[in-house]
Each structure stands twice: as C-alpha cells, then as structure tokens.
UniProtKB/Swiss-Prot annotation:
It comes from the Eukaryota. The keyword Ribosomal protein does not apply. The lineage of its organism: Eukaryota, Metazoa, Chordata, Craniata, Vertebrata. Residues 324-333 have a biased composition (Polar residues). It is found in: Cell projection, Cilium, Flagellum. The gene is C11orf42. InterPro entries: DUF4663. One of its GO terms (cellular component) is sperm flagellum. Its main location: other. Residues 251-265 have a biased composition (Pro residues). This is Uncharacterized protein C11orf42. Residues 234-333 are annotated as: Disordered.
Length: 333
C-alpha cells in the first residue's frame, strides 16, 4: 500500500514506467493479439479507426542499426474518415461500431517489482470501467482513396487501421520504493490502453487495395513508435481538459481504487452502443455475436475460416472481420 500522501507523477514520468510493463499487462488481460498503446500521453491517437503508417529511418541511420533496431517504425497519422478523399469515397466506405462490457468485473489490476535506479520498486497498475469497442468496416478495394495531399502518401505502400480498442474510464499507476517517496498518477477520463489492427495495401494514387494478412508481419507488435505531431494531426476524439490530470491531487490516494460495481443482469449486459456511419454494410445481416467478452484468449473452433469464394460480400472487410472476431465471442446460433 502507498503510505502517506504520494507525490504526483506527470504523464511523461508515468510513460517511462508504462513502457516497462505495458506489453506484459496487455497480453495478460486482453490476449496476445492486442497491442499496448506505446505512450499514455498519446493514447487518444490510438482510438477506433486510427491509421498507422510505416515511417522509414534515414538511409544512414538504417545502415547503422541492423536487425530490429533498423526496422521501420509506426506512426499514428489520424482517423481514417478524415484522411479519405471526399469525392468518390462517399458511399463506398461505411462502418458501424459496437461497444461491449466485460463478462465480469470491469476492473483489472497488475503488480510487479522491478529494479529502478538500483533500488527495488513496486509498480501497481489499476484500470477501471473497462470497455471494448469494435468497428465493422465496408472497404471495397479500389473504390476508396486517401487524400493526395498527405505528406506520407508517396512513400507508403500499406496502412494499418485500428478496428478494436480496449479502454478504461480511469487509470491509476503507483510506485513504491524504499529510496523515495511514493508516487502516483491517476487519470479520470476515458483512455485507450490497447488496440488491434487491420492492414490494407495502397495502390497508385492512394487507392486502398485489399486487406493483407498480419500473420507474418512483425508490425504492429514490437514496433518502434514515432510520437505523433498533435498540432497537425486530425483529432480522433475531443481531448479531455488538462484538469483531468491535475485533479489527481484532490483524489484520495489509496491503491487499489474503489472497485467498479459488477454489471447487473438484464439489459446492462447488452452492447452499450451500436451505430452506423455511411450506408448499412450488413444488409444481409452479420452472424450473431453474443455479448460475452472474455479477457483470456480463446482458440477458434476447428476449421473456422474467413470469407470464402462463395461469399458474395467477400470483397468487403465486414464479413472477414466478423469471422476473425469469432475466436473472442460465443455464437448465439
């Protein structure tokens, strides 16, 4: 337990600790396919439909950094809808989003002891009011184009689109060490903490091509992350007031935080949001997914495949995405 009144951690200081534990935390609670947001201070850049692009290092830098260190980095560049050409893409691109509550307590905790500055330090992380948001996309190849003025377009051959986001409504990170006063960061706002991507090829003039598999792609897992330029990047969501961070001084410091009440039986177990953008991409109706959200990864049933050649909507991203999500949801059929 933290003793006394802890010193407040800044977001930059908390990021230094987050980078030490994020991969282990996210894999333990959300499964191996989820990618941890690289920095808490930039977490809003990794929300639903955010686009990530590869960024090459300068040639002399690549020669000096062999192997993993010389690999291309990923950088968030904004939400997909704001990057599309308005003329020609209207009607071709559509998506709907759905939000799920956990199948149990909407709170997770993690604790680890590490050597920091030569002293053992206990790291405690608590995340509360967890949610999962999923976007179902209709993105027919060859019919949707990116804006020609995007500075990174000429050197980009594929993009990553965030289609699944795990977020929390509050986060608390505490550090306890015998060599220093306890330190604490508590954020009282919605914050993405992990995400999953789809990869799409880019054809000439920024036209989006077909979806590409991620099975042999080393990215986005283990990527070197480039911090976004928040002054020029289109916002993904309204930014929270800075008071959200500084208000932590008025928040009682005990860890863990008050538990989130478990979800009640009844309508509260249903998805809390189901919205369409653009024309309805599911005119046939998708397969029915239950609202059970399991944090531990599960294997798909034997023989489960994506959209096949007999699927008339196989060109779109909606049905393959639904098939890909079958490993995390139980079917009601």
């Amino acid at each position: 337990m933290l003793v006394g009144t802890p010193n407040l951690l800044t977001l930059d200081e908390a990021d230094a600790t987050w980078t030490l534990i994020k991969d282990k935390v996210i894999e333990e609670h959300f499964g191996p396919n989820a990618v941890a947001v690289p920095f808490l201070s930039d977490a809003a850049c990794y929300d639903l439909l955010g686009v990530l692009v590869k960024q090459s290092r300068p040639a002399h830098t690549r020669l000096a950094l062999p192997g993993r260190q010389g690999r291309r980095a990923l950088k968030p560049v904004g939400p997909l809808p704001s990057l599309l050409e308005q003329a020609g893409s209207e009607g071709a691109f559509a998506h709907c989003t759905r939000e799920y509550s956990p199948n149990g307590r909407a709170e997770r905790a993690y604790e680890e002891t590490r050597m920091l500055d030569g002293q053992p330090c206990k790291i405690r992380l608590h995340m509360g009011d967890l949610r999962k948001k999923v976007a179902f996309l209709l993105l027919p190849p060859g019919q949707v184009s990116l804006q020609q003025t995007l500075p990174w377009l000429r050197s980009t051959h594929s993009i990553y689109v965030i289609y699944q986001v795990f977020s929390c409504s509050w986060l608390q990170l505490g550090l306890t060490s015998t060599a220093r006063e306890p330190q604490l960061l508590r954020l009282l706002r919605s914050l993405p903490v992990a995400f999953s991507c789809l990869k799409f090829s880019l054809q000439s003039k920024g036209v989006l091509g077909p979806q590409k598999p991620l099975t042999k792609d080393p990215l986005p897992h283990g990527a070197n992350w480039v911090r976004p330029n928040l002054s020029i990047m289109p916002p993904l969501a309204p930014t929270s007031a800075p008071a959200d961070t500084t208000e932590a001084a008025d928040v009682p410091p005990p860890v863990p935080a008050p538990p989130t009440p478990p979800p009640q039986e009844g309508p509260e177990d249903k998805p809390t949001r189901f919205s369409y953008k653009g024309r309805n991409p599911f005119w046939r109706g998708p397969q029915i997914l239950s609202e059970n959200w399991l944090f531990s990864p599960r294997s798909p049933p034997p023989g489960a495949q994506g959209g096949g050649p007999r699927d008339p909507d196989g060109h779109s991203m909606s049905l393959p995405l639904l098939q890909g999500l079958s490993s995390e949801f139980d079917s009601d059929d």
